[in-house]
Amino acid sequence: AKPDPLWSRGLGDVYKRQGCGTAYHSCLMAKYWFEELTNLDVNIDIASEFRYRKNRFKKDSLYIFVSQSGETADTYAALDICNKNSMKTCAVVNVIESSIARDSNFVLPIHCGPEIGVASTKAFLGQILVLYILALKLGSMRNEIEKKEYQEKIKDLKALPGLIEKTLLHDNDIQAISSTFNEAKGSMFLGRGYSYPIALEGALKLKELSYVHAEGYPAGEMKHGPCLLYTSPSPRDQRGSRIPA
């Protein structure tokens, strides 16, 4: 498949996303955006679960497969199942010559360059940006977003590089905070709304890089059990998004 302006095609009203690990968190983030900006029905799946259960397929569905390498075994297996059921498929990948890109109907490359470290930081940012832009394009095409709002959101995207640079200037502050929790045996990342996927990704990054137990959880569910597992020395990163009551 070749890179394709996906929003220029007549697609259905059901969008399904699949990925593993970081890619799954990208899909979860995109679900919030698509439901808000496009008024489309969106479902997400962990690819390793999707491939091992019986699935119902609707002809108007588009399946989006997110993978940094484009070679994730479970994600490719899920793609193969969808292809065998004649579903429309789209790949969001970093490597456009990959198997997942090759066997998808559409390709949306993230162009992040090689991911050197264990933590897939560049790819995560690239994935959510591509999915956000797709949501904006589809929302505009479906007249769910006014032209002025669309332009403002694009302007905000262009400001991101500068904001990232400012964040990196706080390296010393982050070092000081991390030393406070150096002896912690576990961490809990809490998030609500858009920040819930970020909490999941933050917990995954801590596990991957520090080999410290960490858990991401919806902030509203903290009181239903998880709060009993943590004592005062355990760090809790709380993030919230303003969402309708």
Segments the model singles out, each with a brief description of its role:
Residues 1-15, 230-245:
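Single conserved hydrophobic/aromatic residue that forms the stacking wall/gate
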Residues 9, 13-25, 42:
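Pre-Walker A segment
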Residues 9, 13-16, 106-229:
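Active-site phosphate/pyrophosphate-binding segments
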Residues 23-29, 71-78, 100, 195-200:
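Short glycine/serine/threonine-rich phosphate/pyrophosphate-binding segments
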Residues 30-36, 59-60, 79-83, 106-107, ...:
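Short, solvent-exposed amphipathic alpha-helical segments in soluble enzyme
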Residues 31, 35-66, 213-228:
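Glycine-rich oxoanion-binding loops at beta->alpha junctions
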Residues 63-102, 106-123, 128, 136:
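Phosphate/diphosphate-binding loops
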